[in-house]
Amino acid sequence: MNPTVGALQATFGNAIGRASDMRDGWTSVTVTADRLRDVMTWLRDTPEHRYDYLVDVTAVEYRDRERPLEVVYQLRSLERKANLRVKVELDPRGELAVDSVTPLWAGADWLEREVYDMFGVVFAGHPDLRRILMWETYAEGYPLRKDFPLRGRFSRSEQVRQALNVNPEANYSMEELSIAEAYDELPGDMRERLRRGERGKVRDSE
């Protein structure tokens, strides 16, 4: 077992749940949502462990668990060449919220936005929590949740109408749009405003 697990249990007590070594070589440990920020800060800053690299943030939903939704953080200690998978269990029937780790690892920014967009998990303290794959006014819910219908909740024509009604200038920064293939297809005046850092207004729905 990764020695970090024993150190976590000694430091945080009941906030640390089940732990196991996985077949992929990673060690998995469950943490209560209310202590996540403390645990992650400890993992990053404690010299003996120092998980300095955040590999990924994602989520998984299971049907047969009391708290079926897990937010999963994959950490690596580059110095120690150790891997740790930290999991927080949440219940979709209650408040889907956990502290953001973006203040600890800036690379968590878009990863947490994707989990919010696809699963509806709110990351408290995130500097810019909004959808990243679906448009900002997307109203069908969270596409990777188990209760999301295969074909969506709206008709195909309504989905197309809503997508065409989106104003990308209002919802995305110059940085985001400039790396997208569709950027070259935007009107010239819109690209110029984006270069100046301006934002437009969301079009009114008809």
Model-derived features with residue positions:
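Terminal low-complexity/charged segments
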Residues: 1-206
